[in-house]
A protein has these predicted regions:
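N-terminal secretory/targeting leader peptides
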Residues: 1-73, 83-199
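Short beta-strand-centered segments that line the small-molecule binding cleft or hinge
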Residues: 76
Length: 199
């Protein structure tokens, strides 16, 4: 987001400025939809999956468990009608979005204890996102959605036993490996992920 704001400033020769706030500074990640719709914020870097509580189908606009590779997923979004569906939902709330970045498969998660079979997951408390959280709940995992910055403290305090978040190159910045030392591949729940610039 910061880099985007800097580029807009440069490209407009200072005529258009975007002030970027840290995640959660103005509203929680999953409140950006309503906040932007009501004009409390002008825009947000977000992901449609955060708004699935309002419109469950939006989860499909971010990622699909056991889903397609990023090239196929973006083809569906851009050429197969996926974004047209999203745009119709957003238009009802005076919102518009642009896909702004994507990334490849995630890991299955960071765990405090080694996992050797599904039975060990039963009763576990785990931060999990999107449709994958529904799968984990079916096998007995107590899932909750936390913003990136809230995961490490939750692991540290024992609020959660494990987490999935992103790819290791992103996860390492949050330090999950310091507490949950077991990381498993591949991330079946997010073969590719797409985020958006919501305005």
């Amino acid at each position: 987001g910061v880099r985007f704001g800097d580029r807009v400033d440069t490209m407009s020769e200072g005529k258009f400025k975007i002030k970027v706030y840290d995640p959660g500074a103005l509203v929680a990640a999953w409140e950006t939809f309503d906040a932007a719709s009501k004009g409390a914020i002008d825009s947000a870097w977000t992901t449609p999956g955060y708004h699935a509580g309002k419109y469950p189908g939006l989860a499909f606009m971010t990622t699909v468990p056991f889903g397609p590779a990023i090239s196929e997923f973006l083809s569906w979004k851009w050429m197969g009608g996926g974004n047209a569906i999203r745009d119709r939902v957003y238009a009802k709330h005076d919102l518009y979005a642009l896909d702004c970045f994507s990334h490849g498969p995630e890991t299955s998660g960071w765990f405090k204890k080694p996992i050797t079979d599904l039975e060990q997951l039963k009763g576990m408390k785990m931060r999990f996102f999107g449709l994958g959280a529904k799968v984990m709940s079916k096998i007995g995992v107590s899932t909750q959605l936390l913003a990136g910055a809230d995961i490490y403290p939750a692991l540290e305090r024992g609020v959660i036993d494990s987490t999935e978040y992103s790819m290791p190159t992103n996860d390492i910045k949050y330090g999950f490996y310091q507490i949950a030392k077991n990381n498993y591949f591949p991330g079946w729940h997010q073969q590719s992920s797409v985020s958006e610039f919501l305005m």
